[in-house]
Design a protein with these regions (language model features):
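Short hydrophobic/aromatic-rich beta-strand motifs
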Residues: 1, 70-77, 131-132, 139-141
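Surface loops and adjacent helix of pleckstrin homology
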Residues: 1, 10, 23, 103-104, ...
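Short, solvent-exposed secondary-structure boundary motifs
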Residues: 1-2, 74-83, 182-185, 229
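Short, surface-exposed terminal/edge motifs of secreted or surface/virion proteins that either
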Residues: 2-22, 99, 148-154, 209, ...
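Beta-propeller domains
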Residues: 2-6, 26-28, 72, 126, ...
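Autoprocessing Asn-cyclization modules and mimics
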Residues: 10-12, 17-115
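Beta-propeller and closely related beta-pinwheel folds
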Residues: 115-138, 142-250
Length: 250
């Protein structure tokens, strides 16, 4: 993990065969749905090299429209509030209002200009996660340059899948779907490290240490809250676990 470059994984293919490859995240993670009046119009509902045209630049990348740093970024689009999302990955930028994308899950019917779209949370524009870990059969990541106190978790037992809901007209959210959570505090608490244990995930930030909790047995998209446990604050150094104790540098 590094905030300035996409996430990579190290693969062992044989006794002396190793490969470092970029992670191909599936369907996310995403920023909240567009709230501006700007619409997105795909030139087709399926295929590669499809133009994705904005009606304006307002509401996109701080009113800058498409940027060269959006290449590799995910897009979610739906025909309206009652239809399922499809998603795509930006492969090139033509102008501030036209991006070219490869569609991964088809959009519904014949696309029309709609405000119902979401942009990926991770990109050269928004930054990439600085840290990550595994907990409760999910891959967790945190702290981009634009969202320093946000965590993201993949779908359960699908470590590269950030699909936030089912691909159906109800956009059903199930317990094993991906999730994201932004720590609420009275000041910015950039996440420095994640330390998973047998029954808890400790989150070290610049202003304190936090624990995610749920009312049920496991954390789910609809059952999670992150509470502060201390106000010590953490240095940007990975902690060490000794039994059930987390040793970290302030």
């Amino acid at each position: 993990y590094h905030p300035d470059v996409p996430t990579y994984k190290l693969l062992r293919l044989g006794h002396a065969s190793w490969s470092l490859v970029e992670v191909a995240w599936e369907d996310g993670p995403y920023l909240p749905e567009n709230t501006s009046t700007t619409t997105l119009l795909p030139a087709a509902n399926t295929g590669l090299g499809i133009n994705m045209t904005l009606s304006a630049i307002a509401g996109v990348n701080d009113d800058q429209g498409w940027l060269a740093t959006d290449i590799g970024r995910c897009i979610r689009y739906a025909e309206g509030g009652s239809t399922a999302f499809g998603w795509a990955v930006i492969v090139s930028i033509t102008s501030t209002t036209v991006a070219v994308a490869d569609i991964k899950v088809d959009f519904n019917s014949s696309p029309t200009a709609q405000t119902t779209f979401r942009l990926g949370a991770w990109s050269g524009t928004t930054g990439y996660p600085s840290i990550g870990s595994f907990y409760e059969q999910r891959q967790w990541a945190a702290n981009t340059s634009t969202q320093p106190q946000t965590l993201w978790a993949t779908q359960t037992a699908d470590f590269e899948n950030h699909t936030p809901d089912k691909v159906d007209t109800a956009r059903t959210i199930e317990d094993d779907d991906a999730l994201d959570y932004t720590i609420s505090a009275d000041e910015v608490n950039a996440i420095r490290w994640l330390s998973p244990g047998e029954d808890t995930l400790v989150i070290g930030t610049t202003g304190g240490e936090w624990i995610p909790e749920s009312n049920g047995i496991v954390i789910t998209p609809s059952d999670v809250v992150i509470r502060r446990r201390t106000t010590l604050g953490s240095a940007n150094i990975q902690p060490v676990r000794v039994g059930n104790i987390v040793l970290f540098v302030q």
